[in-house]
């Protein structure tokens, strides 16, 4: 598959765009060190290796990744075969460019898309969708973010899974660094997770999936939903 860019909609909400816009090329250059190194270890108390293990457990040969960051996990994870089909979805062309370049050996297809809106994409027959560190960057409360699952489910085969991680704002341990970072990032519009909690995450998973599971490590919820 060749790389291509297509818009899922003509307009996007200001709040959703604010979170995506923070990922400039300069920020992405230090993202792995700042987020996957420092923040995961010292703020969220969720080692990056555990997220990589999570990817290895649920990744498939036909995979969509949403909110792609730098592509670290797609680069490091172990796909079931050496020739997976990968689609990348994000609002930010910078993250798509960086990730597509990083995993160019897989020749991914890229789409600029807002998952809070219906997705007019000709994608079907996928077995896994990854949402790593996406939900806490979206505006609104956790219950309103259930629309993301609704919009993505049509792209999955029967038995397919949506899996991901999200930093919760309530009901999980937050040390001083985590509290400061959460407050600052919400103020700047990078995060939208002040009111995100475990019970609401359970609710939107239950509403959208035949089966689901959640595990909390530090300030981070790991979730899987199967259709």
Regions found by a protein language model. Give the residues of each.
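Class I SAM-dependent methyltransferase SAM/SAH-binding core
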Residues: 62-118
């Amino acid at each position: 598959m060749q790389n291509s860019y297509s818009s899922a909609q003509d307009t996007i909400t200001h709040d959703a765009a604010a979170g995506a816009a923070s990922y400039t090329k300069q920020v992405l250059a230090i993202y792995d060190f700042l987020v996957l190194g420092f923040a995961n270890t010292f703020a969220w108390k969720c080692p990056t290796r555990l997220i990589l293990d999570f990817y290895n457990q649920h990744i498939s040969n036909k995979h969509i990744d949403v909110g792609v960051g730098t592509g670290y996990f797609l680069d490091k994870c172990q796909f079931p075969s050496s020739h997976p089909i990968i689609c990348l979805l994000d609002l930010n062309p910078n993250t798509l460019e960086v990730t597509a370049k990083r995993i160019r050996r897989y020749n991914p297809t890229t789409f600029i898309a807002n998952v809070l809106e219906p997705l007019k994409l000709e994608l079907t027959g996928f077995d896994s969708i990854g949402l790593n560190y996406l939900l806490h960057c979206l505006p609104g409360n956790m219950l309103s973010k259930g629309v993301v699952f609704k919009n993505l489910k049509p792209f999955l085969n029967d038995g397919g899974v949506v899996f991901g991680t999200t930093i919760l704002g309530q009901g999980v341990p937050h040390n001083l660094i985590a509290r400061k970072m959460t407050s600052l990032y919400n103020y700047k519009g990078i995060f939208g997770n002040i009111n995100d909690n475990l019970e609401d995450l359970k609710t939107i998973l239950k509403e959208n999936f035949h089966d689901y599971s959640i595990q909390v490590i530090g300030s981070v919820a790991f979730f899987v939903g199967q259709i």
